[in-house]
């Protein structure tokens, strides 16, 4: 793209735009490195006609973005640097792992309730302490299949706890 522009339009100022989405900001960064002005816009901020809304296709979207860029109707969003994006990824990953851990704990509690296994009085308020997990590990179901299922949930929980601890250390 850059060589085509420089070959066919030497000395021109190049401007580009794209809608923010799943692909992140790496395209923005690369275009800027090559000397092409680039803005990233919120898709909801792009002026759209009813006809364009009903015929949502790439060629229609491209023309709409080009027309809006040329007329100065677009305002770019803030594009964070790569380091900030990676920090955000770390925080999002931790949040995702905490949600998985919560789901895993709920599955274990559900399994205990399903089989009528009640917590001992001394562990009711222990909130997933080591002692509570040791108690869970000592539970024996009537069949090997039940033991395997419970053990799988407990192993997943321990694995998630290790991951979250490592993420917490990385964040601090």
Provide a role label for each language-model segment.
Residues 1-15:
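Short, basic/hydrophobic alpha-helical segments
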Residues 17-26:
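Acidic, metal-coordinating catalytic cores used for nucleic-acid/nucleotide bond scission
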Residues 25-39, 67:
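TOPRIM-like Mg2+-dependent DNA-processing core and adjacent phosphate-binding/basic surface
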Residues 32-38, 54-59, 112-121:
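A short alpha->loop->secondary-structure connector
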Residues 39-80, 85, 127, 132-135:
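Short alpha-helix plus adjacent loop in nuclease-associated cores
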Residues 64-108, 114:
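Extended, highly charged alpha-helical segments
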Residues 92-172:
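Glycine-rich, often acidic, oxyanion-interacting loops/wings at catalytic, nucleic-acid
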């Amino acid at each position: 793209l850059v060589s085509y522009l420089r070959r066919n339009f030497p000395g021109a100022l190049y401007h580009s735009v794209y809608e923010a989405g799943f692909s992140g900001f790496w395209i923005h960064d690369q275009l800027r490195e090559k000397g092409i002005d680039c803005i990233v816009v919120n898709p909801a901020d792009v002026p759209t006609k009813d006809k364009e809304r009903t015929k949502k296709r790439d060629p229609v979207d491209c023309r709409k973005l080009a027309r809006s860029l040329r007329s100065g109707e677009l305002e770019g969003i803030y594009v964070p640097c790569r380091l900030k994006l990676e920090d955000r990824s770390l925080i999002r990953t931790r949040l995702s792992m905490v949600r998985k851990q919560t789901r895993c704990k709920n599955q274990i509690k559900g399994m205990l309730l399903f089989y009528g296994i009640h917590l001992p009085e001394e562990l009711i308020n222990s909130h997933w302490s080591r002692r509570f997990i040791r108690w869970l590990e000592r539970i024996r179901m009537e069949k090997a299949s039940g033991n395997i299922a419970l053990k799988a949930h407990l192993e997943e929980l321990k694995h998630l706890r290790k991951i979250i601890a490592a993420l917490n250390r990385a964040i601090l």
